[in-house]
């Protein structure tokens, strides 16, 4: 029971940080919006890049963090908005988490 309280508290603390991160990066916002549109399905890097009209390198940076441009602590995975699913032959599929769906839904209102 204590873990449920701690999880809810951490999600509430995380929410403003997530919203700030999405507002600071157009690419992160486009990726989250695209994954929201195709939810509950996921997508792979190059497909996300194609639909967001950016490069796969930018997608990887926004999702995982890369160098100074995309800080790891502000990455979509680190913020628990996106989760990584591995499928078969080294295929990485990214999908929006339930927290990510809640936040994108609230931002669209």
Give residue ranges: language-model regions.
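Short capping segments at the starts of secondary-structure elements
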Residues: 38-44, 57
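Short alpha-helical segments that sit at the start of domains
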Residues: 4-32
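A short acidic, leucine-rich amphipathic alpha-helix
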Residues: 47-51
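Short, amphipathic alpha-helical interaction segments positioned at domain boundaries
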Residues: 91-109
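Short amphipathic alpha-helical interaction segments
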Residues: 53-75, 80, 88-91
């Amino acid at each position: 029971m204590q873990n449920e309280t701690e999880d809810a508290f951490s999600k509430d603390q995380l929410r403003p940080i997530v919203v700030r991160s999405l507002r600071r990066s157009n690419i992160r916002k486009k990726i989250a919006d695209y994954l929201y549109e195709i939810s509950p399905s996921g997508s792979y890097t190059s497909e996300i890049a194609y639909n967001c009209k950016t490069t796969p390198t930018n997608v990887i940076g926004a999702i995982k963090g890369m160098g100074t441009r995309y800080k790891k602590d502000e990455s979509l995975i680190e913020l628990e908005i996106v989760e990584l699913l591995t499928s078969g032959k080294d295929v990485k599929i990214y999908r929006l988490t339930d927290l990510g769906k809640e936040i994108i839904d609230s931002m669209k209102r």
